[in-house]
């Protein structure tokens, strides 16, 4: 009798353990479109990029409900994911990897422009380094101007090695976190360069890649390209780093139309006088302070942001490239200090 009870207990523990195991997967397409509902017509919530590890928490037909590191919970199709066991995920995470640094590219079957395309790539995608011997990176993994890479599902192919760098350890800055001493001036310049490379990319609600970006997606992908993880949304990005004062007249009780009408060059220059290159600039409701937009300050009264498309605009009324909603500036934060 005791043996039977013991066997039952062991069986129950085994079933419980199996039931509690998380279903994990890795994004295997250049961009994974995460939608509000399991339907192609459903709203795009965000994108995740190749090489990102996600958790599967639901299933409906060929749709998988996933939780990404952003964190976001939404639906993606099974073909954009490679499901892995816990052991496979551990092995994947330990493997040496490349970060794809160009705005856009391809993986081909052979190291030549005539090679058949296996998949496209966008900046921020992560690819495994091809290893021929255990623990050693193969010197034959590079072929002239080409590098051999491995996709999450194990397929291998070739892309330009100039567009790759070894993936470094990433800094995760969450809302409320200080970033003091974590980001230097050189890194911030690289963030700005990444943003400039995306100029002209169309605005896409929920987008976070060279295929389309929204305002906070632009900020997140440019920092991610430089091994810094920021929150996905502007309302959380504003809570990172060090707050910088926006010095402007009290607008309490005034309508947005009144604020816009009274916003002049002197008020604008005074509002941004404390900003330095690389600061994040936030816009929204001047009375409530709610955040609806973000850009990266470039200095000289200009910022780069995603509005209609990725573009550079002035924050000073009267300038030729003046941003029409600059009067809605409400907050700013500094990540490099």
Regions found by a protein language model. Name each.
Residues 48, 121, 272-275:
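Short, well-ordered loop/turn sites that connect or cap secondary structure elements
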Residues 51, 122-127, 278:
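Loop/turn positions that initiate beta-strands
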Residues 114, 177-182, 202-210, 284:
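Second-shell loop/turn segments in exported
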Residues 195, 207-226, 230-233:
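Active-site nucleophilic cysteine motif
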